[in-house]
């Protein structure tokens, strides 16, 4: 079974840091924040095998560009599958205006 390198963009790392900070600092739940961060990180690392398992997004031009969406709890991980690598572009709260935030 083919394995892919998983690359996380600076923007996606920043998104994850903001998610952690919001839960830990604003909601005053540092243990919950760490758990959420770890679940997202583990899900991202799991993309090294069968990254095509998640659907392409429905909006254009993102769909044509090959952008896929993986749900992790209340968050969406957006990524593109290349020949040998998966590139994670963003990690966003699923209840937000995702199409607007992706552009």
Residue locations for each model-derived region?
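Basic, Lys/Arg-enriched alpha-helical interface segments
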Residues: 1-63
């Amino acid at each position: 079974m083919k394995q892919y390198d998983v690359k996380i963009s600076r923007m996606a790392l920043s998104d994850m840091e903001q998610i952690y900070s919001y839960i830990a600092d604003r909601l005053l739940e540092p243990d919950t924040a760490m758990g959420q961060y770890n679940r997202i990180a583990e899900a991202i690392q799991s993309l090294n095998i069968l990254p095509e398992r998640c659907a392409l997004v429905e909006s254009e031009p993102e769909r044509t560009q090959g952008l896929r969406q993986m749900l992790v709890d209340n968050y969406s991980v957006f990524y593109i599958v290349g020949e040998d690598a998966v590139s994670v572009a963003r990690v966003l709260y699923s209840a937000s205006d995702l199409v607007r935030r992706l552009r």
